[in-house]
């Protein structure tokens, strides 16, 4: 199956600890955790968002 390697993850704001975004990533090709600058609607500014596992 084509999407068997993809894992659902959440992107959590480093400042307010809210999970603002969800996405998928290929766990075989991207082994390190994602860290992106994204917009946080609670703080109304761009902050660093780090990858967390979703239940």
UniProtKB/Swiss-Prot annotation:
It comes from Campylobacter fetus subsp. fetus (strain 82-40). The keyword S-adenosyl-L-methionine does not apply. One of its GO terms (molecular function) is structural constituent of ribosome. Belongs to the bacterial ribosomal protein bL33 family. Keywords: Ribonucleoprotein, Ribosomal protein. PANTHER family: 50S RIBOSOMAL PROTEIN L33, CHLOROPLASTIC, LARGE RIBOSOMAL SUBUNIT PROTEIN BL33A. One of its GO terms (biological process) is translation. This is Large ribosomal subunit protein bL33. GO terms for cellular component: cytoplasm; ribonucleoprotein complex; ribosome.
């Amino acid at each position: 199956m084509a999407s068997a390697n993809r894992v659902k993850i959440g992107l959590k704001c480093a400042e307010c600890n809210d999970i603002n975004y969800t996405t998928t990533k290929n766990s075989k090709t991207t082994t390190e955790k994602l860290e992106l600058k994204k917009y946080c609607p609670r703080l109304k500014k761009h902050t660093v968002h780090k990858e967390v596992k979703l239940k």
